[in-house]
């Protein structure tokens, strides 16, 4: 449903730790999900408030020489496979993204400005909420499509 492929698509990953309020990535579902998306050719922007870029590289078995830790404020250029960002307060991170995947239930992800984010994304833009933390009404009012574990496509 995501244009038939994720190859060369910008996807924003929100959360990498196995649960909120920790930097522990052991057995995190995000590892498998991100590996599979990278293997399919997706371009990932990864944000977790506590997990470092070096930990993500280790978990994904990525050579640091080919990864990029983005500390700049320009998110319009395509990432090189993946980028780690320390903050999502600058909503430019969502520019030209096809989907957002919420993989950890951080409190800050509950308070995102979905209407503003939706304006920056490429339609039909998706939110994949693996933690059931977003407000369904806010997502639909913003024009985004929502998929949840256990619910599938939420209409």
Residue map of PLM features:
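Structural/interface elements that position substrates and couple domains in central-metabolism enzymes
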Residues: 1-155
């Amino acid at each position: 449903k995501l244009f038939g492929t994720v190859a060369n698509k910008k996807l924003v990953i929100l959360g990498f730790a196995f649960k909120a309020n920790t930097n522990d990535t052991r057995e995190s579902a995000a590892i498998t999900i991100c590996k599979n998306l990278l293997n399919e050719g997706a371009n990932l922007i990864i944000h977790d408030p506590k997990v470092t870029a070096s930990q993500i590289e280790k978990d994904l078995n990525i050579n640091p020489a080919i990864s990029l830790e983005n500390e700049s404020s320009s998110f319009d250029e395509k990432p090189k496979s993946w980028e780690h960002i320390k903050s999502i307060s600058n909503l430019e991170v969502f520019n030209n993204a096809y989907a957002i995947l919420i993989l950890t239930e951080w409190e800050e992800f509950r308070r995102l400005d979905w209407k503003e984010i939706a304006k920056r994304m490429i339609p039909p833009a998706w939110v994949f909420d693996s933690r059931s933390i977003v407000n369904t009404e806010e997502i639909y009012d913003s024009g985004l499509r929502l998929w949840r574990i256990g619910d599938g496509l939420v209409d």
